[in-house]
């Protein structure tokens, strides 16, 4: 979505991220977000159409960046390996290390976004789950495929469950 007024758009995104992380999506109100951003109450509707679209835009922007970092890390490892299977630890570092790297991204608001992701896992919301699943599925699949190659003697369903457990554990 292209912002109509970049300054107001960014203020809304920043305040919404903070409030969603602190209170959760369901308990955050449009009035509270616009008040924190010090903008007109109608600003969310003007820029995003709805609170739901605001959340979607926020998650899309952050997840696209995070997943791009993950794919770059995996691609770099694969190009260095010269078609040999990667070590499982390398694959996991590429996937989960990007989350830790995001904490250092002060200009990208990594810490607040990770709090939002953690909160969304603790307080499941169908909307948040569907947005993040849609953005993460293709990336997660690439990492699982890399783990399948790295661990050919481990049943695929066991790898899938272990990976799923690790993803869940990062939220707690």
Predicted ranges, named:
Residues 1-7, 78:
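N-terminal intrinsically disordered/low-complexity leader segments
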Residues 11, 19, 23-61:
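Helix-turn-helix
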Residues 9-14, 48-71, 75, 85:
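An amphipathic alpha-helix adjacent to DNA-recognition modules
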Residues 72-111:
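Hydrophobic alpha-helical connector segments
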Residues 112-122, 156-172:
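Hydrophobic alpha-helical segments that form the core
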């Amino acid at each position: 979505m292209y912002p109509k007024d970049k300054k107001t758009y960014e203020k809304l995104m920043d305040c919404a991220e903070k409030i969603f992380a602190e209170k959760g999506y369901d308990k955050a109100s449009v009035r509270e977000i616009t008040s924190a951003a010090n903008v007109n109450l109608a600003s969310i509707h003007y820029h995003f159409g709805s609170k739901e679209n605001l959340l979607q835009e926020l998650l899309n922007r952050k997840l696209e960046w995070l997943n791009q970092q993950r794919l770059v890390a995996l691609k770099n490892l694969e190009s260095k390996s010269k078609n040999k299977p990667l070590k499982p630890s390398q694959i996991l570092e590429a996937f989960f290390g990007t989350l830790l790297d995001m904490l250092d991204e002060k200009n990208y608001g990594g810490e607040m976004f990770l709090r939002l992701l953690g909160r969304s896992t603790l307080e499941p919301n169908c909307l948040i789950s569907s947005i993040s699943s849609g953005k993460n599925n293709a990336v997660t699949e690439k990492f699982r495929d890399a783990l399948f190659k790295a661990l050919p003697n481990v049943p695929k369903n066991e790898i899938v469950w272990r990976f799923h457990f690790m993803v869940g554990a990062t939220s707690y």
